[in-house]
Amino acid sequence: MMLNSDTMELDLPPTHSETESGFSDCGGGAGPDGAGPGGPGGGQARGPEPGEPGRKDLQHLSREERRRRRRATAKYRTAHATRERIRVEAFNLAFAELRKLLPTLPPDKKLSKIEILRLAICYISYLNHVLDV
């Protein structure tokens, strides 16, 4: 069975990911991790670096404020961006592997991630039907 994403119809409710708004591109680079308001730096004054005078001030801060200040360091942001890049690459590799298993016309047709998932659902349903008959 060859699947064609143009004529495929499913009874699935529409989701915000169907809008193809570019969220799949957002995870590849350095950016805010969503944990604190305002993104990197957040417009807040940074605390003193370890070893600088004023280190004792950090002991009086709430746990959440200490976390925000730790996440504001360049070292933390760089490490987070690296982890996120690795995660996104693994995610994209998994989609590429799934895409290779789906028969489509033409075989090299470029599909979005949502199209890959929907075609996989249809193909698995078709294979189940073939096994049941």
Swiss-Prot record:
Which residue windows does the record flag with biased composition (Basic and acidic residues)? 52-65
Looking up CDD domains in the UniProt record yields: bHLH_TS_HEN1
One of the Pfam families matching this protein, by short name:
HLH
Q: Where are the transmembrane segments?
A: none
UniProt-listed GO biological process terms: cell differentiation; central nervous system development; positive regulation of transcription by RNA polymerase II; regulation of transcription by RNA polymerase II
The residues forming the signal peptide are none
The answer to whether UniProt assigns keyword Nucleus to this entry is yes
**Could you tell me the keywords of this UniProt record?**
Developmental protein, Differentiation, DNA-binding, Nucleus, Transcription, Transcription regulation
Location comes to:
Nucleus
- The protein depicted here goes by the name Helix-loop-helix protein 1
